[in-house]
Each structure stands twice: as structure tokens, then as C-alpha cells.
UniProtKB/Swiss-Prot annotation:
The gene is katG. The keyword Oxidoreductase applies. The lineage of its organism: Bacteria, Pseudomonadati, Pseudomonadota, Gammaproteobacteria, Pseudomonadales. It comes from Ectopseudomonas mendocina (strain ymp). One of its GO terms (biological process) is hydrogen peroxide catabolic process. Formation of the three residue Trp-Tyr-Met cross-link is important for the catalase, but not the peroxidase activity of the enzyme. This is Catalase-peroxidase.
Length: 716
């Protein structure tokens, strides 16, 4: 018998020590290769918007209504109604969104993948998804999981007597976990790394929750202290990261806790492993409990055993009634979690599964915050005294919660999209220009004759378009918000702002196009001039139709989060990033939905076009600035140049001749990474080769056009 026959089979694909094990700080270029067609079973020709048009929307909603009261033996409905758990599922799908980087949220159906499917805060939500499966199976690809999660939450509210604000579909599923979202550095669930929360209980960017594995905050108060006043700071920190204000916070918490219950029938030691850690025969279900039946009255989820209202399957104002009517004393759930019970109160809260059995009202520590925090308390009292104001505030806040990460309203699908434009949707006016081919040609001629350099033209277009974020679909060139606060005041945009008056002059003289279109067209003219100077004739694709937003349509505070701490494409950095500069370049590329080859072509092209934010010479490895050549790559890979940092910060470098020691170039880490990182160097070598000149021009034009049109959802 051979040695192979005697030994265990231990050489499966992907086994063994990985590059990440050897070099933990290796640049994550792989983040730019996520969600490719190779992982999508529907194929590149599948169009979700077209598939959704074929959906029998009324029939789907009717099926969801029936599901709400169709209690299953394997997971019985609390109070005979699944609505509360579907509200929780929808909330926790959308609730991972954070404004800091636009990542997270419910727009991609990520809740069914790790780590979210196994977060402690999502315990037993896997059961809600399984309850939905027969409906998803029936309607197939005409409704995405991502849309179904949110719609199920809406229908749950409606089936319990609440009037929702509306629903917009359009969330397209992906087929693997997002790798780009930084959920934190903790290695234990519910841990708190010092990098997440500082001594003043302030969340650091980009995190949106106070603990690893929580959607928001610890419901027992900071560090399970039971301190409802201290909890206010954590609540604000997390909800503010979702762009919610105090009124929306109160409405969401109180509205959500009008329904259902929390589950803590026994200590958490009774729970089995989460879905990703469960055995294969569990078929993706987790947290199997060995306490009693394991479900129904014996359910162990959060460890808290709280029912807030006397009508937990019906909309009411009873949450606020109980909150203000009773005094509260600290107690513990059967699982040992800190919670509150109404003092000297009658047993008026129905049991979820035993008819005729009642309990005293109970609350979470974070519920009491809504009464005893001075500012939250004022809002809560107003909602208590004006139930209609509460209902309206909750409807609007719920709509915002579940749609905040979808981008502009133009992306919404379906018959229930509200007509009202909301400021958080970054509204745009109706188009008033429709330039003809002759109009566009005239504008291009005016731009070419303006005296603006290639670097100026390219810089202004890049500054306008590169605010786009693929996570929440915000930003981009449409709207020309570069000319408005806050973007006009950003440090990185000051070169571009100096160019704007000339483009405004051209736009007004023509009167045939929006400023937004003129800005993009200016960049295209610059690229065409640079390509022609390199000996390659190109027509950069241009799609007119952009409009110009007004300042009153632009929430300054909301747009402030779109400002990049670093934009390596134009060699900009605020400094003191806390991470290697080149990681921020990859981060920016990922937000722009670029591939690694697109990143490479764009940086190399922008450098020789002279598009640095401050006009500096860092990375401008050419004596033909304004020509779209491959000089950046040729000279970067030239072994006759030796690089050395100019100081201990290792941020700026000098490239000297190997023989004469004379300074030839200067560069930043954003430049040198294309020679140091083995993957990026492989791409750089393609463009530095003798047959790479024309390829670079064509690849640059394609990537450039992609960035200019990232927010053109009207073109889909």
C-alpha cells in the first residue's frame, strides 16, 4: 500500500497556511474582486428590475398576510402572530447600515450570510427566514431576499393595524458575504475593542454598534450595568450613525417595542451553536435549545424576558402608557439578564403561549432611557399625549430605517413608493435640459477653448463624480453638488472649485445643458485631449441628462460624511489615518465599485494627466504632463530608480538615480504600492509593456466612464 493510502486526506483545496497567516498586514486587493459573475447563479444577463415587473405584488402581500397567523409546530408564533418577529428581522437587516462609510444595511440580502446570520443580536432570526422560504420559493427571482425581508416587516406592521408610509423595492441580492465591511477587531462575541469605543463612550469610525455582534446597543445598558441614563449616550451614538435624530430614535424604539416580546426563558447555556457553527444536519439553523421544548414558552433568544404592551399583536399607544404610568424596579430575567418590572402593578400583560395567563408589565433598561433622559423624555411625553404624532413619526422613521441605504428614489420599484420627496433621499429636480448632439459638440468646443489644462478639466470631473459610494448609492456627479455646501468647502476640492467659475460661464452661455453635465463633459474633453496627445484617438462616451440640485435639497450634515479622509486617486490625505495610506486607496476603489485593474489604470492615468488635488508632482513620473501615456508605470518599474522615504512618517518618498543619486521623482505610498504589492505590480507590468500604451488609454477611458456614470440609475 502506498503512503498516500495510509495517510489522512489532508491536501484539500484552500487548506494549509495562507498568505494572510504569513503576512497579516497584506493589502486586501481581493476586496475589489467581490460579487463577480462567477458567484452569481442568475448570470450577467439577469435584470432584477425587469423580473420584479412580472411579480404579482398583491398576491405576494396577501400570502405574507396569511403567513403572519399560520403558526407552525416547529416554531409556534408568539400571541398567535409572527408579525413581531418579522419586524425584528427587517429591522436587523436594515439596521447594520452606518453613514460613516455607507456600508452595511439591507440592500444586498446579507442577513442570510455570515457573520450577520450568526450574530448574537440576530439569534433565532434564522427561523423567520425559514418561515419565509415557501413564499420565496413560490415567487422565485421576481422578489429578492433583500426586498422580501423588508416587505415582510412592512406587511407585519400592516397586519397588526399600523399604517406604513410606503415601500420601495429594488434591493438586489448578492451571493456571498461582503468582505469589505469592517465589523470590528474583537475575537469574542459581544466584545468591545478599545478601538471601537473610547473612554468617553464615543464610537470611533466606521463602527455603528457598541459591541461586536450587536445591531445597536446593549439593552441592559452600558456593559450590562442597568444604567438607563448612561445608556442614552450609547443609543445616540449608534442611531446617529444611521442618520437618525432624537425624535426618530424615540419613535423607532417605542414603535418596535409596541409589538411582541423578548425571549429569555432560561440561561443562555441552553442554546446550541449559531448557524455557522451548527452541525451539518441542522441545515443552517442555529441556537437549538435544550430547555424544555426549545421553542414557544421555552424560547431562549436575547436572554431578556420582556413583553411591553397588553396588545403585543396590535398597534397601540400602550408602550408609552406603561412607561409613564408605572414606576419601575430592577429585576432579572430567568436567564439572569437585567430588566425592569412595573412596581405594584396588576398582571395585565398576556402570556405569549398560555391562554388566560398574565404578567406584570416589563421594560428594558434602554426603554426607561426614553422616559428619564431629559431630551428623550420630552419627546416621549409628547408622543404619549399625541398618539397620532407618534404613529406618523414611527411610520416615517421606519421607512427611513428600511430605505436609507438604497440611494436616490430613482432606484425604487413597485406600486407603493410614496410621492413625497424626503431630504435624506438626496432629492434632485426634474430635468430641464435635453442637449442634442450638436449642443454637446458646441459645449465641447467651448470647453476646449477655455484655456483650462487637462489636469484642471480632469480634476473637476473627478471631484464631482468620485463622491459616489457603492454601499448606500449616495454621491456622484448628478446634482452638481460640488458647487454646493459642504462639498465646495472640502480641502480636497479646492483645485476643482477654482475651475468651476469658468465651467459655470460656459454652461450659462450655452444654456443647453446642466452644470452637472458640463462638469462631466469637461473631464471627458480633458481625457480626449490627453489621449490624442498620446497618439490614440478616442471618443469618451457621454450620456447627458444630469440635473443641478439646489442647496435646500442638500442636507449639509448628511453630505459631510461623504468627504473622504483620503483619496489616493488624486493623492489626497488628511493625515494621521491610523492605517497604511494604501489601504485607504483600496477602500476608496471598493466604494467606487472598481476592480483592481480599473484601480490601476485610473491611478496611472490620473498621475500623468496632472490631476493631483493640490497640483503637486507626487507620482507624476513623466515629462509630458497632460499626455495619457504609460509613463507612470514605465518609470515606476525602472530599476535605475532607488526609492527612499524623506522622513520617518514613510508617507513621501524620493526616487533617485541609482548611479548619480539625483532626485528624479517624488511619490506617496499611493504611487509606490503599484510597484511593491505583487498583485498590483502584475497589473502595472501589463501597462508598462511595449504593447500596453493603447491598452492603458482604452482601459482608462472605460474605467473613467464607469465612475462618471456610477449614479446614473436612470440609464439602467
Amino acid at each position: 500500500m502506498s503512503n498516500q493510502g495510509k495517510c489522512p486526506f489532508n491536501h484539500v483545496a484552500g487548506g494549509g497556511t495562507t498568505n494572510k497567516d504569513w503576512w497579516p498586514n497584506q493589502l486586501r486587493v481581493d476586496l475589489l474582486n467581490q460579487h463577480s459573475d462567477r458567484s452569481n447563479p442568475l448570470g450577467e444577463k439577469f435584470n432584477y428590475a425587469e423580473a420584479f415587473k412580472k411579480l404579482d405584488y398583491k398576491a405576494l402581500k396577501a400570502d405574507l398576510v396569511r403567513l403572519m397567523t399560520d403558526s407552525q409546530d416547529w416554531w409556534p408564533a408568539d400571541f398567535g402572530h409572527y408579525g413581531p418577529q418579522f419586524i425584528r428581522m427587517a429591522w436587523h437587516s436594515a439596521g447594520t447600515y452606518r453613514t460613516t462609510d455607507g456600508r452595511g444595511g439591507g440592500g444586498r440580502g446579507q442577513q442570510r450570510f455570515a457573520p450577520l446570520n450568526s450574530w448574537p443580536d440576530n439569534v433565532n432570526i434564522d427561523k423567520s427566514r425559514r418561515l419565509l422560504w415557501p413564499i420565496k420559493q413560490k415567487y422565485g427571482q421576481s422578489i429578492s431576499w433583500a426586498d422580501l425581508y423588508i416587505l415582510a416587516g412592512n406587511v407585519a406592521l400592516e397586519s397588526m393595524g399600523f399604517r406604513t408610509f410606503g415601500f420601495g423595492a429594488g434591493r438586489e441580492d448578492v451571493w456571498e458575504p461582503d468582505q469589505d465591511v469592517n465589523w470590528g477587531a474583537e475575537v469574542a462575541w459581544l466584545g468591545v475593542d478599545p478601538k471601537r469605543v473610547n473612554d468617553e463612550r464615543e464610537l470611533t469610525a466606521p463602527f455603528g454598534a457598541t459591541h461586536m455582534g450587536l445591531i445597536y446597543v446593549n439593552p441592559e445598558g452600558p456593559n450590562a450595568s442597568g444604567d438607563y441614563l448612561a445608556a442614552a449616550k450609547d443609543i445616540r451614538a449608534t442611531f446617529y450613525r444611521m442618520a437618525m435624530n432624537d425624535e426618530e430614535i424615540v419613535a423607532l424604539i417605542a414603535g418596535g417595542h409596541t409589538f411582541g416580546k423578548a425571549h429569555g426563558a432560561a440561561p443562555e447555556s441552553h442554546k446550541g451553536p449559531e448557524p455557522e457553527g451548527a452541525p451539518i444536519e441542522a441545515q443552517g439553523l442555529g441556537w437549538t435549545s435544550n430547555f424544555g421544548s426549545g421553542f414557544g414558552k421555552d424560547t431562549v433568544s436575547s436572554g431578556l424576558e420582556v413583553t411591553w404592551t397588553k396588545t403585543p399583536a396590535l398597534w397601540s399607544n400602550n408602550f408609552f402608557e406603561n412607561l409613564f404610568k408605572f414606576e419601575w424596579e430592577l429585576t432579572k430575567s430567568p436567564a439572569g439578564a437585567k430588566q425592569w418590572v412595573a412596581k405594584d402593578a396588576p398582571e395585565i400583560i398576556p402570556d405569549a403561549h398560555v391562554p388566560g395567563k398574565f404578567h406584570k408589565p416589563t421594560m428594558l433598561t434602554t426603554d426607561l432611557t426614553l422616559r428619564f433622559d431629559p431630551e428623550f423624555g420630552k419627546i416621549s411625553k409628547r408622543f404619549y399625549e399625541d398618539p397620532q404624532a407618534f404613529a406618523d413619526a414611527f411610520a416615517r422613521a421606519w421607512y427611513k430605517l428600511t430605505h436609507r441605504d438604497m440611494g436616490p428614489k430613482a432606484r425604487y420599484l413597485g406600486p407603493e413608493v410614496p410621492k413625497e420627496d424626503l431630504i435624506w433621499q438626496d432629492p434632485l429636480p426634474a430635468a430641464i435640459h435635453n442637449p442634442s448632439a450638436a449642443d454637446i459638440a458646441d459645449l465641447k468646443a467651448r470647453i476646449a477653448a477655455s484655456g483650462l489644462s487637462v489636469g484642471d478639466l480632469v480634476s473637476v470631473a473627478w471631484a464631482s463624480a468620485s463622491t459616489f459610494r457603492g454601499g448606500d448609492k449616495r454621491g456622484g456627479a448628478n446634482g452638481a453638488r460640488l458647487a454646493l455646501a459642504p462639498q465646495k468647502d472640502w480641502e480636497a476640492n479646492q483645485r476643482a472649485i477654482k475651475v468651476l467659475p469658468k465651467l459655470v460661464e460656459i454652461q450659462q452661455a450655452s444654456g443647453k445643458a446642466s452644470l452637472a453635465d458640463v462638469i462631466v463633459l469637461a473631464g471627458n474633453v480633458g481625457v480626449e485631449q490627453a489621449a490624442k496627445a498620446a497618439g490614440v484617438a478616442v471618443d469618451v462616451p457621454f450620456a447627458a441628462g444630469r440635473v443641478d440640485a439646489r442647496q435646500d435639497q442638500t442636507d449639509v450634515e448628511s453630505f459631510d460624511v461623504l468627504e473622504s479622509a483620503a483619496d489616493g486617486f488624486r493623492n489626497y490625505s488628511k493625515g494621521n489615518l491610523g492605517v497604511p495610506t494604501e489601504t485607504m486607496l483600496v477602500d476608496k476603489a471598493q466604494l467606487l465599485t472598481l476592480t483592481a485593474p480599473e484601480l490601476t489604470a485610473l491611478v496611472g492615468g490620473l498621475r500623468v494627466l496632472g490631476a493631483n488635488y493640490d497640483g503637486s508632482q507626487h507620482g507624476v513620473f513623466t515629462d509630458k504632463v497632460g499626455v495619457l501615456s504609460n509613463d507612470f508605470f514605465v518609470n515606476l518599474l525602472d530599476m535605475n530608480t532607488v526609492w527612499k522615504a524623506v522622513d520617518d512618517s514613510n508617507e513621501v518618498f524620493e526616487g533617485r538615480g541609482r548611479k548619480d543619486g539625483q532626485v528624479k521623482y517624488t511619490a506617496t505610498r499611493n504611487d509606490l504600492v503599484f510597484g511593491s504589492n505583487s498583485i498590483l505590480r502584475a497589473y502595472a507590468e501589463v501597462y508598462a509593456s511595449s504593447d500596453g500604451k493603447e491598452k492603458l488609454v482604452k482601459d482608462f477611458v472605460a474605467a473613467w466612464t464607469k465612475v462618471m456614470n456610477l449614479d446614473r440609475f436612470d440609464l439602467a
